[in-house]
Amino acid sequence: MISTGKAFIHENFMLQNKTAETLYHTYAKTLPIIDYHCHVPPQEIAENRQFNNISEIWLHGDHYKWRAMRAVGVEETFITGDGDDKEKFLKWAETVPYTMGNPLYHWTHLELKRYFGIDELLSSETAEAIWSATKEQLAAPERSVQGIIKESNVKVICTTDDPSDHLEAHQQIRKEGACQAAVYPAFRPDKALVASAPSFVPYLETLGAAAEVDISSLRSLLEALEKRATFFAEEGCVLSDHGLRTLPFVDTTEKEAEAAFQKALNQETLTPQEEEKYQTYVLLFLARLYNKLGWTMQFHLGALRNNNSRMVEQVGPDSGFDSMADDRFAESLNRFLNELERTNELPKTILYTLNPIFNEVIATTIGNFQGGGIPGKIQFGSGWWFNDTKDGMEKQMTDLANNGLLSLFVGMLTDSRSFLSYTRHEYFRRILCNRIGEWVERGEWPADEKWLGKVVEDISYYNAKRYFAFPK
């Protein structure tokens, strides 16, 4: 009989040596969480939503789980369709045993353990009991959204918000003052950059209405974006974010960018080069604006999105049909950063790559632009999306350590739509401590507990606290 004699999620889960155990339990375990990039709906925090069942909090927006369910043959009715919540949960429970090796298996059981005290492995055999137990617990006041945030020891949450958003939810959260965490918006102007998209012109109307600007020229667009960024800053925003397949950079002038913008405004087809000129001009404007505002600029690079056209048409975009791109961006990235650096207008920046073959491109690029008296000014962001795995996080840490300064890394973020995903910070911290422990046990790092403990504390919490200019 195969048995370890202990629960799957136990106190030393993922900690494979004594150094790792000491570092995690002494230095990382109890630190607060700064979740500086996520996709949780701020309205649910403002309303202090109470979930009726675990499907609502687990399955209603999680494309990671949806992909796994499709892979084992679950019908779409029970994924994004009109199947009822319990049916969807039972189908997920049937799927879970097949996810071993995928972080979904670890995340699922870590969340069941931390929030519901459940040690049983989720499967079709345990599904009914786990459904009932979680449903009962989710009805308790401490399992409201704000209750979960408090229990998770979250101090800061940065949501992801369109420039046209009026941020009423953030204002309500701040006004009521009941949420333990400070909740700030983050500025994501992606819709203003895709000039070739059919949605571009309608979006300009939405943005213009929010900014009270008639957007009829490139300058009026930039005016609208600046007005909205200023408003976001007044609401506590200190980060921007851009999701781009690759980072465009071509030589361009205002006249060329204006010409491309006018073609888009007239719904004429842009050439790829015209769109790149427009995007380069707008991105440089925004980066300089972020620097003026004291923000951190984030680039999430390398997602090839919405590839299954039949399914996207059926269930909508961003529903689990994305994968890694392999577009090269080393030269354009360096040219973009250099264009800002040469006039001393480069803001603090975090670079993420979805494709890990570009890890060392980013890890070496950030070293080109450090300085300004800011420790770790340009960051290689944590393993993202398909790299949000044990191997992916270890590779990101190792590549950063090999080519830069791991000790200045600002650490983990959930990038999640679920309020149970704060356990991913625990998962990350365990992997961090284990990786450092391996280096120590092999004699590659000195067994200096005081210094190692400081490094673990800094990466887990304090580097982010110092790096981001959150309101006091």
Swiss-Prot record:
SUPFAM superfamilies: Metallo-dependent hydrolases. Signal peptide: none annotated. The keyword Isomerase applies. InterPro entries: Metal_Hydrolase, Uronate_isomerase. Keywords: Isomerase. Pfam families: UxaC. GO terms for biological process: D-galacturonate catabolic process; D-glucuronate catabolic process. Pathway: Carbohydrate metabolism; pentose and glucuronate interconversion. Its EC number is 5.3.1.12. It catalyses: D-glucuronate = D-fructuronate; aldehydo-D-galacturonate = keto-D-tagaturonate. PANTHER family: URONATE ISOMERASE. Belongs to the metallo-dependent hydrolases superfamily. Uronate isomerase family. NCBIfam families: PRK02925.1. This is Uronate isomerase. It comes from Shouchella clausii (strain KSM-K16). The lineage of its organism: Bacteria, Bacillati, Bacillota, Bacilli, Bacillales. The gene is uxaC.
